[in-house]
Amino acid sequence: MPEGRHIFPQMTVEENLEMGAFTDQADMARTMADVYERFPRLKERKRQLAGTLSGGEQQMLAVGRALMGKPKMILMDEPSMGLSPLLVKEIFAIIREVNKQGITILLVEQNAKMALAISDRAYVLETGTITLSGDAQELLNDARVKKAYLGQ
């Protein structure tokens, strides 16, 4: 899932979801029903142009489109970018739920506190080099991480 959502703004919500699916129509219908169950707001707006959705709804659409391909893993690049604090919490709850359903999430995120709070394992990069790695909860409590990335 690329940074900045990258939806197709002139297409409807439903058309955007179809872009992420395989071509088997029956399978696509089942997967779309699953996405709509996870994101009821998208179902309410399925005929609406994607470019008119709020930032949070566009992020939900980007996640939904990624899920349409029934992936084993999703790379998410800055999913909280440009969202209000309330929507950030909502998106991170969605990421956690997707992961609980067996999909591996590789999360690239500057909001270290939120990312560490929902992660199992974490890596800290500085100028492209891994400087720390380990259990996310341990890193969340690490004094070096707190000082450098969590403002504590």
How should each PLM-predicted stretch be described?
Residues 11, 53, 66-67:
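ABC ATPase signature
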Residues 9-18:
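Short coil-to-helix segment of the ABC ATPase nucleotide-binding domain corresponding to the Q-loop/switch region
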Residues 19, 63:
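Hydrophobic anchor residue at the start of the ABC signature
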Residues 68-72, 78:
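A short, proline-enriched helix->beta-strand linker immediately N-terminal to the Walker B motif
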Residues 89-101:
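Helical segment within the ABC ATPase nucleotide-binding domain
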Residues 121, 133:
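Short, glycine/charged-rich "phosphate-handling" switch motifs in NTP-dependent
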Residues 49-53, 57:
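Conserved ABC ATPase signature
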